[in-house]
Amino acid sequence: MKRTYQPSKLVRKRRHGFRARMATVGGRRVIAARRARGRKRLSA
């Protein structure tokens, strides 16, 4: 059985990156919530 986490910088950016978040309403909410909490990193 292969492991479920096969790291890839490109896939990580495309799925969880800032621009991916900003592309949807839900993603924008995620960014807003993380800004409100004062997170140092908003996205991947």
Curated annotation (Swiss-Prot):
Keywords: Ribonucleoprotein, Ribosomal protein
GO molecular function: structural constituent of ribosome
Keyword Ribonucleoprotein attached: yes
Cross-referenced Pfam families: Ribosomal_L34 (PF00468)
PROSITE patterns with a match to the protein in the record: RIBOSOMAL_L34
A biological process from GO: translation
Any one cellular-component term (Gene Ontology): ribosome
Gene3D superfamilies: 1.10.287.3980
Family as reported in the entry's similarity comment: Belongs to the bacterial ribosomal protein bL34 family.
The protein's name: Large ribosomal subunit protein bL34
Organism: Methylobacterium nodulans (strain LMG 21967 / CNCM I-2342 / ORS 2060)
Source organism phylogeny: Bacteria, Pseudomonadati, Pseudomonadota, Alphaproteobacteria, Hyphomicrobiales
